[in-house]
Amino acid sequence: MDENFIKKEFDATKWDEIKPFAKELLERRLNCANCIETLIADASELGEHISEAGALLYIDMTCNTEDIDKKNAFLEFSTNVRPKLSEFSDKLNRKIIDHPKLDNLPERYNLIIKSIRTDIEIFRKENIPLSVRQTELVTESQSINGSMTVVFDGKERTLPEMNVYLESKNRIERAAAWKKISDRRMEDHERLTEIFEELI
C-alpha cells in the first residue's frame, strides 16, 4: 500500500471519531481482487490504531487503580466502543467473504481468509452484552484488589509490597504479615466472591 488509509490524527478511543473510517470501509466499492487486498490492509491499519488506544487505556487503569477517571475511560471504551467494533468487524468480514472475486486473492491471504471465516462462524450479537459485563466485573475486581493496603511496620503498604515480609526469615514477622493480608482480603471477600460467581 503506497499510502496510509488514515491520514490524520484521531482519538481511537471514541466511536464518533472511529465511525467515519468504519463507514467508509463498509461502503467502499470493490471492483477487483486488488480492491479486497486494499480493504483488508486499511481495516488492519484502523484496527491497529484502536488496539493501541485500548491497550494504553488498560495500562493507565491498571497502573492507577485508584484513579476513577482512568477507570471510567477504560470502561467507556469497553462498554461503548468495543461492542460497536464487534458489529462493524462482523459486517466487514461478511463483505469480504461474500465478494465474488475472493478466490482470486494471492495465496498469502489464505490464513487471513480462514481466520475471517472463523470469526464469522463464532460471532453472536447476543454475546456482546455478556462480554461487556465480563469486562465490567473483571475491572471492578482489579480495582478492588489494586486498592488494598495494610498498615505494617509503621507504614501503609500495598499487598504486593507485603510479599517481601512473607519471605522473611523471621517466622513471627511472616505470620504477622500473612494475617494482615488475610484480614484485609476478608474485608472485600463477599464482593469478590459475588464477582467470581457471576463470572463463572
Which residue stretches match the model-derived regions?
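A well-structured
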Residues: 1-200
